[in-house]
Structure formats: structure tokens, C-alpha cells
């Protein structure tokens, strides 16, 4: 069974006014997202998830990660995103990103892990007023990558304290 690397990175100041940090990037549907690596515990390939009766629709179930029970969240359902469309010959490279949010751990389902990138804080732009998919209140900013954008999520705003408490009690 693959457990993926446990990621332990810290922000590295590059210069007095130019702080660089790392983002774990992944695909959800047709969009590319990033999360500050400081909030990521590890990345795990798809495993068995046990459904939970009466859980919110966006909760896929729970996952046993080395004797620790982790709730698994489907951001497609939470934010009404389209599922990834796979062409013949495409390989599904999905799994979970295990996050540390407040004092809780939770997993989010991803369609495809991309890579870890270093980004300068000045490269992060405010999110556009009109953005499709995930609401602007959950977005830290966007980073231009060639002709497209990487949406940087703020994991501390994805769930309220009350929601995190409910997830911890599943």
C-alpha cells in the first residue's frame, strides 16, 4: 500500500520583500488548484473509503490512515464542480490530499496531482470578481501560469469551525 511522502516544508524568504512559498497543485475537473504546502500532511493514492450514513452529501466517507480516521471530502460535490472527463488512454491519477486544518485532519479527493511549485507572494493576484466553480471567499488568489491560471485555495476558509467540528465527530 502506497502512503506517499509526508511533506514537511517551510516558507523560505528569498529576499527582504520577496517571500517565496510552495504550493501543492492538483486538478479538480478541468481546473488547476493549489494549496500552501504548510497545510498539507501528505498525499495518498486512492484507497477504500467507508461511507457514513447521514453525513453531508459532500462527505464521501472515512478513511483509515495508519489507525487514524480521516473524513474524506469531495470538493466536486461541495462546490458543484464538474467531474474530470477522461479520454481513452488517460490514466486516472487521483487520490487524497490529507490536510491539517485547525486541529483536525481531513482528506480532499483530487482528480490528478500535478506537482509542487515555488511561488513568490507578488505573483499571487487577487481573485477575479466573477469566478466559476469555487466561490471567491475560499480563494486566496490566482497565479498566472502561461495562458492559464492556478487557483490558490485558502484551506482555513473551506470549512467553518462548526463544519470542522461536525467532521471531527463523524
Swiss-Prot record:
It is found in: Cytoplasm. SUPFAM superfamilies: CheW-like (SSF50341). CDD domains: CheW. Residues 20-164 form the CheW-like domain. One of its GO terms (cellular component) is cytosol. It comes from the Bacteria. GO terms for biological process: chemotaxis; signal transduction. InterPro entries: CheW, CheW-like_dom_sf, CheW-lke_dom. Keywords: Chemotaxis, Cytoplasm. Gene3D superfamilies: CheA-289, Domain 4, SH3 Domains. Involved in the transmission of sensory signals from the chemoreceptors to the flagellar motors. This is Chemotaxis protein CheW. The gene is cheW.
